[in-house]
Amino acid sequence: MXXXXGYLEFDGAQQQSFLYPLFFREYIYVLAYDHGLNRLNRNRSIFLENADYDKRYSSLIVKRLILRMSEQNRLITSTKDFSQNPFLGHTHLFYYQMISVLFAVIVEIPFSLRLGSSFEGKKLKKSYNLQSIHSIFPFLEDKLSHFNYVLDVLIPYPIHLEILVQTLRYRVKDASSLHFFRFCLYEYCSWKNFDIKKKSIFNPRFFLFLYNSHVCEYESIFFFLRKRSSHLRSTSYEVLFERIFFYGKIQHFFKVFVNNFPAILGLLKDPFIHYVRYRGKCILATKDTPLLMNKWKYYFVNLWQCYFSIWFQPQKANINQLYKANLEFLGYMSSLRLNPLVVRSQMLENSFLIDNVRIKLDSKIPISSIIGSLAKDKFCNVLGHPISKANWTDSSDSDILNRFVRICRNISHYYSGSSKKKILYRIKYILRLCCVKTLARKHKSTVRAFLKRLGSGLLEEFLTGEDQVLSLIFPRSFYASKRFFRVRIWYLDILYLNDLVNHE
């Protein structure tokens, strides 16, 4: 996004107010399609087989789209027109796909510029470790072991399009862009109810931006109250009303806030609260009593219903004890495990046995969901029995083998932090046997005959780089013992979710 700022002809103060003209400039389309903004998401997938519509991009199509956008009536196509002229309908569908990609780039410009200006004058250490999604696990291992309760909340989605438009209005001040944004959203809803071969008009990057904007709005209020909660007993609530007045909310919300929240916020004094958001859920952990968690739950319900006009079901916010609950987090099943320890103490001639309990965060692989994801991609059946990949038999033997080896190594690298490696080895076994069955099917042979002809050296390709390195680091006796299966290693070069997690 820093390179995109170099192409802009006006300063940062004006960019937030004049985003709409960027939709009519060809170089923005070049940046959106040729600058790697979408290429990264395509290349990191290990299951992707077909190219998307990005390859259909051309300068001629861009010029036609800009010409049509200058007259918005030409972009409106009813479902009746689509039935009468399918070619016209698919053409307009492709235009909306291009606009969605452009939206995802343009609307991020004010955010990236604001973020860059906030970092000016500050010395920040650039490290990929800070970007790794697995860096949260060492933090949870250090913090969650001291907590008692966790509030697991499913973040509600806006049910009306105007809520999304109003949320974005606080960030983007360009009225023309907001009107165009509202127009495209309503056109999307009219197309969504019609059969377009189950393809979405807008790309995931655009919807991810809308979702993050919605969540960022509620989190800004939550973090504000969380920061002020430890001072609420000794300070007045005027600062809270200033915050509400800043957002210009209606009088009804003032009454609800005055009647409900003062009593709630008076009991929110707890400096030991940690907040984590992940895939439509937020986790709130504390070491206090369940009363505090009920207060926060009641606060979330009132916040979404009164502030955002979103109906929220209280049963979607569950309060659980960490010792009894399993948290689905980044593809892992995390829970607290009590490890009993017996310590022998010698004092003069007397010895004592002291029973101690060590609390440890245990991260496991959800084998059922992983097998379900493998079954969706035709690597095995629903019971976990490997099957051959019929659509890969047209490739060469080396391509088939390299595909399976890459998938196996990515899974091993991602789930290296599991405390039970036997589940990971079961997944590897499914992929190995699926690879052998695919090659045997290609050569019209049985699995036994194919392995007998090539030998066991074929399966040695699946030995991951982690296994090779760890065999050199740890002693051979430890590497072959059962203790090695409980060694957890978090790699801080993982920036994205594994595809098996995305397919859940």
From Swiss-Prot:
One of its GO terms (cellular component) is chloroplast. It is found in: Plastid, Chloroplast. Pfam families: Intron_maturas2, MatK_N. Keywords: Chloroplast, mRNA processing, Plastid, RNA-binding, tRNA processing. The keyword RNA-binding applies. The keyword RNA-binding applies. It comes from the Eukaryota. GO terms for molecular function: RNA binding. Its main location: plastid. Belongs to the intron maturase 2 family. MatK subfamily. This is Maturase K. The gene is matK.
